[in-house]
A protein has these predicted regions:
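Short, surface-exposed loop/turn segments at secondary-structure boundaries that line and modulate
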Residues: 6-11, 17, 112-135, 283-285, ...
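Catalytic phosphate-handling regions of large nucleic-acid enzymes and associated NTPases
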Residues: 1-14, 28-51, 242, 249, ...
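Stable alpha-helical structural segments in soluble proteins, enriched in small hydrophobic residues
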Residues: 16-28, 91-94, 98, 102, ...
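Glycine-rich, flexible beta-strand/loop modules in the N-terminal catalytic cores of phosphate-handling
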Residues: 1-11, 70, 77, 228, ...
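Conserved phosphate/anionic-ligand binding catalytic regions in large, soluble enzymes, centered on
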Residues: 11-30, 225-249, 328-344
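Flexible, glycine/charged-enriched surface loops at secondary-structure junctions
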Residues: 33-35, 102-120, 151-152, 174-188, ...
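Extended amphipathic alpha-helical scaffolds
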Residues: 121-267
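Mobile "lid/hinge" segments at catalytic clefts and subdomain interfaces of large enzymes
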Residues: 25, 29-148
Length: 344
């Protein structure tokens, strides 16, 4: 648990919390593959800056957060004003070097006061059992994974897994106790998941075929429509494959901007993108409530993408709100939101 007690506007509480969480876990008995750390990277006057101040970020072409271990980067979040690939890669490497410095500092503390980690046993799967299940399932799993229709594919995989699990349960039910049968079921499912992963990865990496049978550079069927809603300022429908976003844009006076009063300096937004992901879009039922992490995260992603091409306040003195309603989803509804939002 991270509790913010005091905030220096030039030092991000999020990055401080990340550092503190890593250090607290690292010095404890809890097994942990850290330590980790994170930094922000800005780009002002073609020079990279670690943890830029709010004033520097205002003039920065790049707002990049990099987190990772001593050996690798494991999280990236960014918004930018059309930064090229070479610059982005350099920024990542620059940020990772700063991450390493923070981790070295943590290591000094860990070496001094860190506790010995708890030992634990993982579930061990006999080699003979893995080989036997692989022989039984590999060919059928390969066939199921090549089914192009998503629901049909999922049903075929589920039926195959259930068939093989039941085969082993029936085969061993007279010899094993209930607890042993449950453990065997877990082992069989783990083996089947490994087989599914390896076959699917092989299809993608070696054969360059995607989950629905498309080539790596092949795009799903696209369709668009605009001005579907007669009483709105702007509306657009974007469909790619089985993913569909209905985007509605509304204009308001500048005084209707959103006021942001959080831990940082009070700020305001004249452009907002809100993303809604109802349960029916993926064939499920569920209650409607406050936005979850998905809605907040996808909305922020789409907002960052469109914000860079929104006219300045001097050119277009209005508040702009875009709402993306996901009507169906089969991958990358955030991308659909950006396209529909741009058209609306």
């Amino acid at each position: 648990i991270n509790t913010v007690l005091s905030v220096d506007q030039d030092c991000s509480p999020e990055l401080t919390a990340m550092f503190g969480s890593s250090l607290a876990t690292s010095i404890s008995k809890i097994p942990f593959n850290g330590p980790i750390a994170g930094v922000k990277v800005g780009l002002v006057d073609d020079k990279f800056i670690i943890n830029p101040t709010p004033e520097q970020l205002e003039n920065s072409k790049l707002d990049l957060t990099v987190a990772g271990t001593m050996d690798a980067i494991n999280m990236v979040e960014s918004s930018a004003k059309e930064v090229d690939e070479k610059t982005m890669l350099e920024a990542l490497m620059f940020g990772h070097e700063a991450v390493k410095t923070l981790i070295k500092f943590q290591m000094e503390i860990i070496d001094e006061i860190g506790e010995e980690k708890m030992e634990y046993e993982t579930l061990k799967i006999p080699r003979d059992l893995r080989k036997e299940v692989s022989t039984l399932a590999t060919e059928k799993m390969d066939k199921a994974l090549r089914i192009k229709d998503k629901l049909e594919k999922y049903n075929a995989i589920d039926e195959l897994k259930e068939e093989i699990v039941n085969h082993y349960i029936v085969k061993n039910q007279d010899e094993l106790s209930d607890d042993e049968l449950k453990e065997l079921e877990v082992k069989i499912k783990m083996i089947l998941n490994d087989i599914e992963y390896k076959i699917f990865r092989g299809i993608v990496v070696k054969e360059h075929i995607r989950a629905d049978g498309r080539k790596m550079d092949e795009i799903r069927p696209l369709s668009t429509a605009i001005d579907l809603l007669p009483r709105t300022h702007g509306s657009a429908l974007f469909t790619r494959g089985e993913t569909q976003s209905l985007s509605v844009t509304t204009l308001g006076a500048l005084g209707e901007h959103q006021i942001l009063d959080g831990l940082g300096l009070e700020d305001q937004k004249r452009f907002m993108l809100h993303y809604n992901f109802p349960q029916f879009s993926v064939g499920e039922t569920g209650r409607y409530g406050a936005p979850g992490r998905r809605e907040i995260g996808h909305g922020a992603l789409g907002e960052k993408a469109l914000l860079q091409v929104i006219p300045s306040e001097d050119e277009f003195p209005y508040t702009i709100r875009v709402v993306s309603e996901i009507l169906e989803s089969n991958g990358s509804s955030s991308q659909a939101s950006i396209c529909a939002g741009c058209m609306s």
